[in-house]
Amino acid sequence: MAKPVVETPLMRQYFQIKQKHPDAILLFRVGDFYETFSEDAIVASEILGITLTRRANGAAQFVELAGFPHHALDTYLPKLVRAGKRVAICDQLEDPKKTKTLVKRGITELVTPGVSTNDNVLSHKENNFLAAVSCGKEVFGISLLDISTGEFMAGQGNADYVEKLLTNYRPKEILVERSERSRFNDLFHWSGFIFDMEDWAFSSENNRLRVLKHFDLKSLKGFGLEELSMAVTAAGAVLNYLDLTQHHQLQHITSLSRLDENRYVRLDKFTVRSLELLSPMNEGGKSLLDIIDHTITPMGARRIRQWIVFPLKDPARIQARQRVVEFFFRHPEERAIIAEHLTEIGDLERLVTKGAMGRISPREMVQLRVALQALEPIKEVCTHADEENLRTLGGKLELCKELRDKILREVMPDAPAALGRGPVIAHGVDATLDELRALAYSGKDYLIKLQQQEIERTGIPSLKVAYNNVFGYYIEVRNTHKDKVPAEWIRKQTLVSAERYITEELKEYEAKILGAEEKIAALEGQLYALLVAELQRYVAPLQQDSQAVASLDCLLSFAESARRYRFICPVVDESFTIDIKAGRHPVIEQQLPADEPYIANDIYLDTDRQQVIIVTGPNMSGKSALLRQTALISLMAQIGSFVPAESARIGMVDSIFTRVGASDNISMGESTFMVEMQEASNILNNLTPRSLVLFDELGRGTSTYDGISIAWSIVEYIHDNPKAHPRTLFATHYHELNELEGQLDRVHNFNVSAREVDGKMLFLRKLEPGGSAHSFGIQVARLGGMPHHIVQRATDILHRLEQEREKIEEEEPKTKDTKRGPSEKVKNASPTLPRDEKGRSIDGYQLSFFQLDDPVLSQIREEILDLNIDNLTPLEALNKLNDIKRILRGY
């Protein structure tokens, strides 16, 4: 930004600091206020709703000003960060009382959407990830860091893999090379906060050295990243950004985990959204997370979000989780003991981070001690359980007894939220501190004693000893008794009805008291700093405790879901079979009225006999719910949860793909046929033998012919794919697809049943073998409140179209067509209505698909049937097409 002409020393200092962070809002500490100036003040006043004013800035100059009290920082800072602003906090670096010149100021922290440890900025149930993406020609690196927890990860892969990670981890801020910003936007279409860094911040060699330096290593083999140069480049960019934002205390970032796509089920952004895993698509709806998250600690809440979007592909790890859930399910007493003590732990993970960064408050130090005390009974239950995996988890809990006992001895149990706001260090810790406190806190007794002494000496019964900030300690005498005042008293202030005096004894006492308070503050600060330093020695075991508690909390949550919702333990194995008996949708079931049972359904899929199920049925019958519940049950099984069914066997799934139709809450701007085809293409290009594929109403965004053709060919492709036979559910209103059952061995028709009783729809919501020939669209339109005359007219038209279809079917040759592809019935599936000269359909006319007796059409048909396509040259084809055009024109 251009440097304005400035006059006052304060504003000169402000603009010098502002020039170093032109893209951040600068909160400039002036006395007891944080002030913003110029453009920052205008922006801050709009976001924070604070008054915008102006102040003089030298001769004939004014500058915009907006500010708030320093103690309100925790209130206003989150609002700026959530608005996507970077905020530079500029504090006074020296005591204004000790300098006669301009107070020295400097940036103490740069807070951004992705880099914050402020509790009011952070969400307790979500991670606050900062991401960096390094862009290569084909391979991209990605690194993610939550500075508030110390979680640091890196990986690399193609653009699709990076997009999946961005979708599932939901970083609050992404770092990109400035020269690659345009390409990044074209590839990922990220709508969140992006920060462009200079290209040097993504230097491959420099960033490798930066990562090695942070961990004090000579090789990254221990992290499994030695050969992943793009991943390491991204990780180095994250560390460079922390340097830039003045975050230098990073002892809690103790490891760099490799993001390995082979460990987890592939879920793309469309699947996460359409299955409503983390958030509902409709306002007031519920997500899977809302239903199964019964975690107690913030660490558990954050962990379960990650587990949901990263299901496991290793049956052994899945079964290990299941066995712990089973133990908790069958042992309610142990479950209750652990749950009770988890409530006492709080956010241990972020407390450890604050301790490592030297920012833990006295009150938080007490909470850390409470958390460590709560770990002991939890460890006791776990290590004595008759379940091996739970014992292993309990063995990871470090009680850190020395630290716990030290905090118990040295910190007041009711310690204040900050140093200087009350006593922090307990009595008996330091003899000097105890002496100073005795001196400072005995003031009331001393003043009462002095006051009584002077009353007796002077004979003034109304004499009063008091204190204020202006004059300090003084003796007040009413005017009626001022003739009794001793000569050695010094008059300090004259009031209307009284005089105020000081004495040498009072002056000495005041100096002693005020000096003691300053010494108490300094000594408490020193003793507390030593305690924080001791805590920092325990960062690694405390982080291990946090991880173990998070996992324990999630498994306890799964057991609670099983208890509440009648979930069962599924079998997860290496087979290719999905066999669900009486499966239920975990979210919809919990939203039904108490007296309305959920209609359960069976699903069987494999790769040998029943690979593809075509599901037909009317709107509102439950087709979409059936598809989604199959995917959700499979996903829940592979995160280690119990599932809503009577029994379930899940042959391990390595990817779940979904494609929902345009009416199924596709966000605005994406409900186009092109996007539908792009998503379908993405699925077809990434199929594996273990994929689970859900197509819901594919092809509705175009004409009927086009839609049927595309849907038909996709089912054929999935069935005939030589490399993979993915298990597939295909819900459709194109009843013509039912013909595929007779042509493709592993395709089977099912329908979600509905009945029309006395002109009213009865949705049975039961999956039955066989295809459906009716969509009951008109009945659904009636239920939706469509005007009666429109419903009646639609009914008449439907009857005529059905009669015409029956007529055509009767005229079809009875010979069996052995060719694969749609029958003549499907090909002639688009009837037309005769119209008058204004284009309106003529009521009462016989409807027809084609004017079959039209001689022109008969001639064209004969011309086409007589063609020998195998011997036709391109030129002859064009000539024949021209002949047909002449026939249509009538010459």
From Swiss-Prot:
One of its GO terms (molecular function) is ATP binding. Keywords: ATP-binding, DNA damage, DNA repair, DNA-binding, Nucleotide-binding. Disulfide bonds: none annotated. It comes from the Bacteria. ATP binds at G617, P618, N619, M620, S621, G622, K623, S624. Residues 805-827 have a biased composition (Basic and acidic residues). It holds the Pfam family MutS_III. Residues 805-840 are annotated as: Disordered. Coiled coil: none annotated. GO terms for cellular component: cytosol. The keyword DNA damage applies. The keyword ATP-binding applies. GO terms for biological process: mismatch repair. Belongs to the DNA mismatch repair MutS family. This protein is involved in the repair of mismatches in DNA. It is possible that it carries out the mismatch recognition step. This protein has a weak ATPase activity. PANTHER family: DNA MISMATCH REPAIR PROTEIN MSH1, MITOCHONDRIAL (PTHR11361:SF34), DNA MISMATCH REPAIR PROTEIN MUTS FAMILY MEMBER (PTHR11361). This is DNA mismatch repair protein MutS.
